[in-house]
Amino acid sequence: MLYYVNKFLSNSKVQAVILGIIGLATISMLVSYKLDDPSFNSATTGYTNNLLGIFGSYLSDFLYQFFGVAAFIIPLSCFIWGKNCWQQKYRKSFIRISVMLLALFSTAALLSNFDLEFVPSNGGGAAGIIIFHFLKQFTNQLHLLLVFFTFIIFVVLFEIKFTSLSSFIIKLGKFLAYKIQTFFYNLFSQLTLPKLFSGKANNKIKITPSYTKPVNEKIRFTEEPKPIMAKPAPVNPIKFFNKPTVPKISQNDATALPPISLLRNPENHHIKGASSSELKQKAEELLTVLNDFGVKGQIINIGQGPVVTLYEFEPAAGTKTSRVVGLSDDIARSLSALSTRIAVVPGKNVLGIELPNKQREFFCLKELIETPEYQDTSTLLPLVLGKDLAGKPLIADLAKMPHLLVAGTTGSGKSVGINAMIVSLLYRYTPEECRFIMIDPKMLELSAYDGIPHLLTPVVTEPAKAVVALKWAVKEMENRYRMMSNIGVKNIAGYNTKIQEAVKEGRIIEKSIQTGFDPETGRPIYETVAMNMEKLPFIAVIVDEMADLMLVAGKDIEMLIQRLAQMARAAGIHIIMATQRPSVDVITGVIKANFPSRISFKVTSKIDSRTILGEQGSEQLLGMGDMLFMGNTSKITRVHGPFVNESEIEQITEYLKETGTPEYISAVTEQSDEDDSSIDIGDGTSDEVLYKKAVQIVRDERKSSISYIQRSLRIGYNKAANLVEKMEKEGIVSPPNHTGKREILLPER
């Protein structure tokens, strides 16, 4: 019984009605008060004129005696509180009581100097007289009247337009702060100070943008990659310089980090969320829907985020999780919601039911780049993913992933998410520290970055060149491994640290290479050669549409991606691979096994969601940047991505093009004669090479079956059948006999 009473009284409409009744009753007994009615000061037994009878007569006399005419503040406050409850505008209880008491005692003290005939005491009652005479000994009467009048004006502003007034003051303060910050930034960024104490390397004054990184920071890799939700840390990012296989950028053309002013400011930062009563009401509706489908339980916690609200539902004993998860579409229909996602909350005995908010918060990339989480130096390659369900910034470290697989349909926000990741790297590293290989078969998404100095080659749009670029990345990885092996380190962090220490000490690191053999003893002859004393940069390989490449050169692309994904982490080469068709022929088992970190934007079906994440749920996302992020701990987190528009990308790329000139490496997309040319990329040259290799296999192995050639060349059945038919036409093999076997007409070697 008590539960239902509390539930009834917790309703905002009921609270508003109760406050209205109390206010109406109080003002009725105050208005109908008569001096000759029975009261504490009058012992008459006559008829009472008060509308509330003998109770109203005594209570109104007490209020007049103690507060005077200021007693009308009490019913007025009840009316205002009731109106706020009806409109679901809440303030904390102690704030309500404090404001009412301030208004009550200020009005009583202000009216204590006036004598009124219709009240038993003066205009302010006993409380007004005590307060006024107590404060009068510290100042004169006029000052007191002004102070009490000011308090009353403050209370009126607080109750009527406090929210609008405070919002205006906050916006004005932010606007002025932004203008002052921009003025000083532009002023100091244009100053050029001469070098002081020339000849001393450690005595320099250097003015750098606020996001430039100091050198000499030790790099560390950990084994448990996970999204970073770090505490604020000082901005002290790591900095690398040049590399042996990538051409240096001259000091005159050194590119500065783009200023934060190129990104637009957030617009709708203050979106009103649902009130506590609305959340409770929605929770009750959710429980009703679950009960209708035979699922019992209770909601133990409600967490409201910028896009969705998480209801933690604890099912009754014996309830299967799959039964509740299967009701997601029915719950969305019953609650008139766009979609509903249900998943187990890690570490808790509850199911998380995520319902979209009425008003969705959209946020910009700028506010996330300005967060301490992005500036944390322990995040080596920060990727701005967005905000989690609680609205906290989520910054992932690509160096710890170490590769990322992204999937999502058209309009899901996949391309915007890729742009946000690229921009987050551009705001952390210069071309001397991080280089890109961008592969865009669609020729649309990554074309905006063509010409920036971070690129090792122009944006690759041809599948044939994409294969060559990936082969170059494999060669670069192997070359880096040899360099790291020569100085006895295991990763790029140790290599850069040793190079940096040697440069500080003025040493030259040498390596031994074999130049031949001793003609007398036959032993190998070694010579000592000085190594290149330049640091190695990170290399990020961005593939925007994997499906197009898999259709043209599937087997070769898969082998190259597999090799890079398995070994390139220690060499500082990382892959971000995206596709809008997450089917099993694009995201194969080999690729999934080597990409433990994955992001799924909205997809069309549960099958696609299981393909990319291993479980359903991506089909229930809201689109426009709503995503599920799975780190290599297999924990799935819902994230809402930031928005970065094309004009911001254009401004950033134009700034980078003006401050630095790219120096491309032609070998990235040009296949050399030493490369293995047996890659099936769909052009005439590749078919001819395959045919020659097939003929060689038939001559050497004396086997001409289609399946044997298919296995030997690692090609499809149709391609192998075409090669055998061509050999039959050219007289290399005979037509099949009655058993299907062919005779090899070429002579043995």
From Swiss-Prot:
It comes from the Bacteria. Keywords: ATP-binding, Cell cycle, Cell division, Cell inner membrane, Cell membrane, Chromosome partition, DNA-binding, Membrane, Nucleotide-binding, Transmembrane, Transmembrane helix. Residues 391-610 form the FtsK domain. SMART domains: Ftsk_gamma (SM00843). GO terms for molecular function: ATP binding; DNA binding. It is a multi-pass membrane protein. One of its GO terms (cellular component) is plasma membrane. Residues 163-749 are cytoplasmic. The keyword NAD does not apply. ATP binds at residues 411-416. It is found in: Cell inner membrane. Gene3D superfamilies: 3.30.980.40, P-loop containing nucleotide triphosphate hydrolases, Winged helix-like DNA-binding domain superfamily/Winged helix DNA-binding domain. Belongs to the FtsK/SpoIIIE/SftA family. Consists of an N-terminal domain, which is sufficient for the localization to the septal ring and is required for cell division, followed by a linker domain, and a C-terminal domain, which forms the translocation motor involved in chromosome segregation. The C-terminal domain can be further subdivided into alpha, beta and gamma subdomains. The alpha and beta subdomains multimerise to produce a hexameric ring, contain the nucleotide binding motif and form the DNA pump. This is DNA translocase FtsK.
